[in-house]
Amino acid sequence: MAIGTPAHEFRELNEEELVTRLNEAKEELFNLRFQLATGQLTNNRRLRTVKRDIARIYTVIRERELGLSVVPGAEA
């Protein structure tokens, strides 16, 4: 059962929204790592999920750079 955000949801976002989601995910990962270091983290699996979401966002951005994916709302 997948808990993270599927890649198709990221593909529906435009560039600004992707960058925003990426920054939010990076901030969450930082906070989770801080909680892990202080022993306050209750859900260790969330670390893996956030890392994978970050990787999915980078993948979608790279697909668009290579022209493998179309930006939603862009005219062909």
Swiss-Prot record:
Transmembrane segments: none annotated. Pfam families: Ribosomal_L29 (PF00831). The keyword Ribosomal protein applies. GO terms for cellular component: cytosolic large ribosomal subunit. CDD domains: Ribosomal_L29_HIP (cd00427). The keyword Ribosomal protein applies. GO terms for biological process: translation. GO terms for molecular function: structural constituent of ribosome. InterPro entries: Ribosomal_protein_uL29, Ribosomal_uL29, Ribosomal_uL29_CS, Ribosomal_uL29_sf. Keywords: Ribonucleoprotein, Ribosomal protein. PANTHER family: 60S RIBOSOMAL PROTEIN L35/50S RIBOSOMAL PROTEIN L29 (PTHR10916), LARGE RIBOSOMAL SUBUNIT PROTEIN UL29C (PTHR10916:SF0). NCBIfam families: L29. Belongs to the universal ribosomal protein uL29 family. This is Large ribosomal subunit protein uL29. It comes from Corynebacterium glutamicum (strain ATCC 13032 / DSM 20300 / JCM 1318 / BCRC 11384 / CCUG 27702 / LMG 3730 / NBRC 12168 / NCIMB 10025 / NRRL B-2784 / 534).
